Curated annotation (Swiss-Prot):
Binds 1 Mg(2+) ion per monomer. It catalyses: hydrogenselenide + ATP + H2O = selenophosphate + AMP + phosphate + 2 H(+). It comes from the Bacteria. The gene is selD. NCBIfam families: PRK00943.1, selD. Gene3D superfamilies: PurM-like C-terminal domain, PurM-like, N-terminal domain. GO terms for biological process: selenocysteine biosynthetic process. This is Selenide, water dikinase. Transmembrane segments: none annotated.
Amino acid sequence: MSENSIRLTQYSHGAGCGCKISPKVLETILHSEQAKFVDPNLLVGNETRDDAAVYDLGNGTSVISTTDFFMPIVDNPFDFGRIAATNAISDIFAMGGKPIMAIAILGWPINKLSPEIAREVTEGGRYACRQAGIALAGGHSIDAPEPIFGLAVTGIVPTERVKKNSTAQAGCKLFLTKPLGIGVLTTAEKKSLLKPEHQGLATEVMCRMNIAGASFANIEGVKAMTDVTGFGLLGHLSEMCQGAGVQARVDYDAIPKLPGVEEYIKLGAVPGGTERNFASYGHLMGEMPREVRDLLCDPQTSGGLLLAVMPEAENEVKTTAAEFGIELTAIGELVPARGGRAMVEIR
């Protein structure tokens, strides 16, 4: 079977970050008395479902550690590897850090797909690592029923510049660095609904490196940061609000969207992860039309950064975004928490 004739997405039951275990089920899996062990040097663990773990070395520098892997979200092997690696490295940038090394995680159905195709996947991952300025230093592989690829990434960050998802403040403005709709467009492609003019759009967005995160972290007024991935904008914004004890007001019309996304939602191109996300986070949002809900719960793979920014830092953040060629979009604000109101209010 040639590399050009395969459709990798046919070999997996899920796609990209949409194959994540639902937040509700994950809560059950992670619940453990042993998890309450506290290391005073562990600045960020899994308490707030942040993007990565952070360990203070005690010398002004902290180590960031993360891993992320998934099944194919696109058919092209090289692009699959590149997207998976970009997505994994993003967690380091979302914490305000600089990646220094990565190792690969590969599961491959040896009896179904050739090793040459796996090599192309790995080369895509290596390409993304080079873009981030790091080496793909090794890895581990297993014979698996479905193709899986990703990275474990190590990074460093000045301890005082660590950006968490739980330190936002009322009064912060909310900004996104990438449009939503990745899950919808990739599902539309899988269902042969994607229009020719929309081919490749999701792949291009997923391959954009969130490298600006380290520069955003140097701005004092950036109070919190996370990347929007498998739990959708609603899930990751809800976690930001819960961690900080605030509520969000979001302007739906202001949210950047990939072309055609609302049309594809109406055609039923909604990934399975959308329903799982709504089941976990839907109770935190107010009433809204089904198509709005489906976009906010759309699982993003290698999505953009979500920033909570104090008003006085807005211009500096915009200037920094422009330096990286980012179309930064203001989508709402954070307000003091009040009982009886939805945690995420869509206007």
